Amino acid sequence: MNTDIISGKWTQLKGQMQAKWGDLTDDDFKVAEGNAEYLQGKLQERYGWDRDRAQTEVRAFEKSLRDDR
């Protein structure tokens, strides 16, 4: 998975991610600190998604960022 966008711009993107995934806490984002795999795990935990769904959600978020450029 290409995690360059999320990893490289974590601070700037955190607000957008919090708006999209409101069940994640500030602490979740602090611990994740740019780690997309950890973020996927938290999405699974908070939303009850399987691994594929969480991965799809993160990829779709990354794609939306690329498309917005």
Curated annotation (Swiss-Prot):
Family membership noted in the UniProt record: Belongs to the UPF0337 (CsbD) family.
InterPro entries: CsbD, UPF0337_stress_rsp, YjbJ, YjbJ_sf
Coiled-coil features, chain-numbered ranges: none
Domain of life assignment: Bacteria
Protein name: UPF0337 protein XCC3924
Pfam entry (one): CsbD
Listed Gene3D superfamilies: YjbJ
